């Protein structure tokens, strides 16, 4: 069989071999089935968290769609590190590393088994960019399908997310709640399957997938346990076969306009700073030029129009009921912020998707154009002698634009968390956590334990936090991450001492360590760096290959050529 371009399917290199067919036969794959488009169905099911717990069920529905459309589905799984469960532990250092491992493992399966197309089912934070990176690297017809957001928990009339539990720990330490209330929040926060419910990293990236065009429009917003998930999963499988037959390649969709639309989607919803890292990485794999200044340029002109947690009031399921991303797209098109002609993997343009939006009467999640929640987007990129290569500050959910104070330095996250719990963080402090970068960790941990404890202790309006690590999408407050160069690579963050004055000014986009250059040079000459004790095995391999956070913390040096569009050596069926 061939695609519409007349070229033989890639899979015939495998399925044309008698030996391969013999080994497929016990699995139920006949000659007739093997002659169809072979579509890999990748997922990350595991029992290590609720985010991906529905993946096997979704994979079954996707496979039904593939078979109904005349294709043959091949299900396989890969890993997932659950961010929320490993948060605050050494295990969290594996999270960002897993993005690369997932990408690599999908590439290995697709290239080795010569799949003609791919559906990548994603859920927890790093699985989403990993799926997109794999498709961009392979340039193989396919799509990304998000398994969906968890429903909110409820306690005393309030919607809960997992961040509610993290912040309740800080509130307990501050004497604001008792242990019984913490336990009640803990037991109510996560009512079922699905990824974390606010506009944290998973939902931020799930939105970005639709604006990049890699996910069918409207599919990702459907909550994890919604009955429509069956329908959208089957449709995704059918679409994958069509993409193979029409030879629609990811890089034809992943244009510069698509990346700009994705940036707008994340800054206009107050999304996770992790999107900066991930979009840089996806663009790298797709061969699309993208840099930190693009995020600044777009965020500066993009107001926040979605009132979503952690900076706002609502969760992802509320956005779905309000009218979904199609409604947000209508707002963004009307405001002239996005490229309406950018095309989705389902064949429609963003303008066509937005035109079909149905706004729920009385909804308050997506605000009117003349009532933005903030005049500029939810992040800013700032530079200075503390971050010559740049760093990211989250602006959603607060109005602070500057901070000056003495440094309080910690060599790792655990020491800082204990200091917060012990009440050793004071008003005006600039909390500095270093040795948590891509190399220094290794793995660039998220700091939700610390940031949530600061919020829970009532300090978020009075301190700043600066780190060469990352923040969870659930973080809010005056927090600065991705400081580059990191401490382990000789960055100035490694030279800061307790009491050093630090000034942060969003208006001028500057972060300044107010110490004479001669003193900094003396400290630099005396500083000795020691590798992290975690830097062995896969962690050590990552530390040896990872690039700066300012470049997306990628481990490949350049975009790949992509898989061959024709079978390299189509074998005769009689072999």
Predicted regions and their residues:
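Catalytic or ion-coupling anion/metal-binding cores of large enzyme and transporter domains
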Residues: 1-51, 58-79, 84-85, 90-95, ...
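Glycine-rich, highly charged phosphate/nucleotide-binding loops
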Residues: 95-104
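Glycine-rich, N-terminal phosphate-binding loop and its surrounding beta-alpha-beta segment
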Residues: 66, 105-109
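A short, small-residue-rich loop immediately preceding and capping a beta-strand
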Residues: 109-131, 143-146
């Amino acid at each position: 069989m061939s695609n519409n371009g007349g070229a033989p399917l890639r899979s015939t290199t495998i399925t044309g071999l008698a030996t391969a067919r013999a080994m497929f036969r016990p699995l139920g794959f006949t000659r007739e089935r093997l002659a169809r488009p072979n579509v890999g169905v990748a997922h990350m099911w595991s029992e290590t968290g609720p985010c991906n717990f529905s993946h096997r069920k979704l994979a079954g529905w996707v496979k039904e769609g593939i078979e109904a459309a005349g294709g043959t589905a091949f299900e396989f799984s890969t890993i997932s590190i659950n961010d929320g469960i490993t948060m605050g532990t050494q295990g969290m250092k594996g999270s960002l590393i897993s993005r690369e491992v997932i990408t690599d493992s999908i590439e290995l399966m697709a290239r080795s088994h010569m799949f003609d197309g791919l559906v990548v089912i994603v859920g927890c934070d790093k699985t989403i960019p990993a799926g997109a990176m794999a498709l961009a690297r392979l340039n193989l017809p396919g799509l990304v399908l998000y398994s969906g957001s968890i429903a909110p928990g409820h306690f005393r009339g309030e919607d809960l997310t997992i961040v509610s539990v993290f912040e309740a720990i800080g509130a307990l330490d501050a004497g604001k709640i008792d242990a019984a209330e913490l336990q009640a929040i803990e037991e109510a926060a996560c009512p079922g399957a699905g990824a974390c419910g606010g506009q944290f990293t998973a939902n931020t990236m799930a939105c970005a997938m639709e604006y990049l065009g890699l996910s069918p429009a409207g599919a990702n917003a459907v909550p994890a346990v919604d009955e429509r998930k069956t329908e959208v999963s089957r449709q995704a499988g059918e679409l994958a076969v069509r993409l193979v037959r029409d030879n629609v390649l990811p890089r034809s969709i992943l244009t510069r306009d698509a990346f700009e639309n994705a940036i707008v989607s994340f800054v206009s919803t107050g999304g996770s700073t992790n999107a900066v890292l991930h979009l840089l990485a996806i663009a790298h794999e797709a061969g699309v030029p993208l840099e930190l200044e693009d995020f600044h340029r777009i965020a500066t002109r993009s107001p926040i129009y979605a009132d979503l947690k952690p900076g706002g009031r609502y969760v992802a399921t509320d956005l779905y009921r309000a009218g979904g991303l199609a409604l947000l797209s209508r707002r963004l098109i009307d405001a002239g912020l996005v490229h309406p002609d950018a095309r989705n993997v389902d064949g429609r343009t963003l303008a066509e998707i937005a035109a079909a939006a149905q706004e729920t009467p009385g909804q308050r999640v997506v605000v009117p154009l003349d009532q933005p929640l903030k005049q500029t987007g939810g992040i800013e990129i700032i530079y200075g002698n503390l971050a010559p290569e740049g760093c990211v500050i989250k602006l959603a959910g607060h109005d602070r634009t500057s901070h000056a104070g003495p440094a309080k330095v910690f060599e790792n996250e655990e020491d800082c968390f204990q200091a917060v719990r012990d009440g050793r963080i004071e008003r005006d402090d600039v909390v500095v956590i270093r040795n948590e970068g891509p190399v220094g960790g290794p793995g660039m941990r998220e700091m939700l334990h610390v940031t949530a404890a600061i919020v829970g202790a009532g300090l978020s309006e009075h301190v700043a936090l600066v780190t060469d690590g990352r923040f969870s999408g659930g973080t809010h407050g005056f927090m600065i991450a991705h400081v580059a160069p990191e401490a382990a690579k000789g960055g100035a963050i490694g030279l800061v001492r307790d009491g050093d004055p630090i000034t942060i000014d969003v208006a001028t986009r500057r972060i300044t360590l107010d110490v004479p250059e001669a003193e900094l040079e003396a400290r630099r000459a005396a500083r000795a760096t020691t590798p992290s004790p975690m830097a062995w095995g896969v962690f050590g391999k990552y530390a040896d290959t990872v690039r700066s956070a300012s470049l997306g913390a990628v481990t490949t040096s350049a975009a790949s050529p992509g898989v061959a569009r024709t079978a390299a050596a189509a074998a005769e069926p009689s072999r």
